[in-house]
Amino acid sequence: MKSNYLYLLFICVISCLFVSCSDEDNKGEDIPEWNRFRTTNVLVYAHLSEQNLFSSCSYKEVASSIRNTVHSVALLDRTNAVYGQTAIINTGTETARESKKVPVFVPVSYSNGEKKIIGSTVLFPSTISEMTQYVVKNDCRYLETKTEAVNGIDMLFCSVSLNSEDLIAPAVDAFKKKVNEQTVLVGTVKRALLPNLESVITSNLTSDTYSFVEVENRNRDSEYCIFVLTSHKWAFRGVTETSVSGDLHCFQLQIESLK
């Protein structure tokens, strides 16, 4: 009887060890090894404030940084368009010309008193075959553009900037309708609104269909922060933050297309 008991105890211990090893193996499978050949780089140039992007530097400084940094898409935050006497002046177009990129302006809101459209400019490397801007609310737009991520892998690059509480719910509604396996959404949101944005996303999107990441920056007290929203077909791998001029920084986001 004693030998049978010891035998059963031995079997139980071996079984526990086997299950433990299997669990560890499964955990490893949940986090695949980083394949840098399937990784796209998205650049975000920002003060992470309401400040116009070019208030403390020249177009050429930003264009030079763009030309010398590996990327597939560049987002110029707060390149506000100003109504001139004869035309609308978009400060992002000069950088596009200097860096030989195709610009798309994405509005956030309209300031009637200052006669300007607050928004950002997204720079693409070549002619755009597909591009749509969806209304979030009032003047705020959600950009969706098909472009190459890396090595023949396409993505639907999306962008939106959220500067008020009333934009959160309609923006998340757009995410729910538009986010699919190809989506790589890079946006900015007021830091004070970030908890609400995360909460509404959690309540409205199915947990196993998306990944939401706040991109950490050196200044944890910045008025705005960057976020990345993708399907589980993509993985945010990290960010490299460099100074361009004064408090204008370039954030090089590394996002991998998973097999």
Question: Which residues does each PLM region occupy?
Answer:
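Positively charged n-region of N-terminal signal peptides that target proteins for export
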Residues: 1-6, 187
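N-terminal, active-site-proximal structural segment of metallo-dependent hydrolase catalytic domains
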Residues: 7-10, 18-97, 110-113, 173, ...
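Metal-dependent phosphoester-hydrolase catalytic domains
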Residues: 23-31, 146, 182-183, 191-259
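Structured beta-strand-rich core segments of catalytic domains in phosphoester-bond hydrolases
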Residues: 34, 80-155, 160-163, 225-249
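Structural recognition of the beta-strand scaffold that forms the well-ordered cores
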Residues: 44-45, 72-77, 104-105, 121-122, ...
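Alpha-helical structural signal in soluble globular domains
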Residues: 94-102, 174, 199-208
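His/acidic metal-ligating clusters that form di-metal
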Residues: 144-160, 165-204
